[in-house]
Amino acid sequence: MIKSILTPTRNRPNNCERFIRSVYNATTSKQNVEMLFYVDNDDPAIDAYKSLELHSRKEFEDFKNIKFIFGEPQSVSISWNDLAEKCIGDVLIMGNDDLVYQTSSWDELLDVELKQFEKDEIYVAYMEDGINGERHCAFPIVS
């Protein structure tokens, strides 16, 4: 199952790199993870993002895909929608450049958890973010 992590980002390439590295280090089946980022084309750090994309494609080449999409300034939700249209994942995970994945083998744990939805194939799930608990689905995972 391919997991696409969709992340709008603005003016925080260092956070973005930390996020990519954390996902990479915590992932078991890297070939099943795609990371897509949306960057506004007026972002003051656009050159740093372009450099990060080149660097990330080499350093994290085990990932299925790593890509930065540059476009018109827009809201986070519209950026997520644009990234969703371009991704190849079976599962879409909403990301944020200030996240840090800490759970080892999160991808395999997610596979096990999502098996319960095999028949329905329509669901929303989320990981415990350490802040909202069960009160709020901060970064949804959708089919």
Question: What feature does the model see in each segment?
Answer:
Residues 12-27:
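Short, well-formed alpha-helical segments that are part of the catalytic scaffolds
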